[in-house]
């Protein structure tokens, strides 16, 4: 499975890391994903969601 939020679709971004001497190096920014057990349609599913969606209560967390 890829590192993508299943709620909002947020994924990895690529770009350049720029040092003080202006040397550009490729790097990847990854989303802060959390595995959450939730109940969807009467079934318990484990989904990957970003911390922003978890904070926003888009999906209720099953305890």
Curated annotation (Swiss-Prot):
<comment type="similarity">
    <text>Belongs to the bacterial ribosomal protein bL28 family.</text>
</comment>
<dbReference type="InterPro" id="IPR034704">
    <property type="entry name" value="Ribosomal_bL28/bL31-like_sf"/>
</dbReference>
<dbReference type="GO" id="GO:0003735">
    <property type="term" value="F:structural constituent of ribosome"/>
</dbReference>
<dbReference type="GO" id="GO:0006412">
    <property type="term" value="P:translation"/>
</dbReference>
<keyword id="KW-0689">Ribosomal protein</keyword>
<protein>
    <recommendedName>
        <fullName>Large ribosomal subunit protein bL28</fullName>
    </recommendedName>
</protein>
<dbReference type="InterPro" id="IPR026569">
    <property type="entry name" value="Ribosomal_bL28"/>
</dbReference>
<dbReference type="InterPro" id="IPR001383">
    <property type="entry name" value="Ribosomal_bL28_bact-type"/>
</dbReference>
<dbReference type="InterPro" id="IPR050096">
    <property type="entry name" value="Bacterial_rp_bL28"/>
</dbReference>
<dbReference type="GO" id="GO:0005840">
    <property type="term" value="C:ribosome"/>
</dbReference>
<dbReference type="Pfam" id="PF00830">
    <property type="entry name" value="Ribosomal_L28"/>
</dbReference>
<dbReference type="InterPro" id="IPR037147">
    <property type="entry name" value="Ribosomal_bL28_sf"/>
</dbReference>
<keyword id="KW-0687">Ribonucleoprotein</keyword>
<dbReference type="GO" id="GO:1990904">
    <property type="term" value="C:ribonucleoprotein complex"/>
</dbReference>
């Amino acid at each position: 499975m890829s590192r993508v939020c299943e709620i909002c679709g947020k994924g990895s971004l690529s770009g350049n890391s720029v040092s003080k001497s202006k040397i550009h190096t490729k790097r990847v920014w990854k989303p802060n994903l959390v595995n959450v057990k939730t109940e969807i349609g009467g079934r318990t599913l484990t989904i990957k969601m970003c911390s922003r969606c978890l904070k926003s209560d888009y999906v209720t967390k099953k305890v």
